[in-house]
């Protein structure tokens, strides 16, 4: 494609308006995030949009759980992140796709030590967590963007799994009892091969089953019998 054709295709009224609007308000403010504690130790940060929560959490999440960084002490640089996530067309769909995040306290503290300079979005997130975690011996940070109730339920599973030993034991018992179920295997394989999970795969599968949303679309299986079992954790 010649340069002039590229500009004609890319420079439309909509793309220009979006680009110019984006330049008007780049800085995050404390008012851009709502902070609450749904239950003891669970620090919930709610953002208006998916890009807002993803901008705030992408480095700490990749440090804790990412394919290229999870399980290591390496800091997550923006250059490496873009190299790993940008496709050949220049798209980084991470910031429009991932709408929920969960970070246990030990990972959050370790990431802060390695992170170096913070973006404005990260600084607002860190300040919010520092205030909310004051006096807490153990906590889990969850961040959600938008208003999807399934995303919130999914992240709440992770927080309960980390903070509530009884809940974790019951969830682990279900995982062990059904790890060889074809539906459970299908979920874990999709997580590993298509969604780039390396660590905490069984926990992640359990969180999706506990949520029970869009199972067929994402994993190719309804897994209704497993969804029922994991959702019954609320009744125990």
Predicted regions and their residues:
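A metal-dependent hydrolase signature that marks the N-terminal structural subdomain at the beginning
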Residues: 6-139
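Short, surface-exposed linear patches
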Residues: 67-69, 164, 173-175
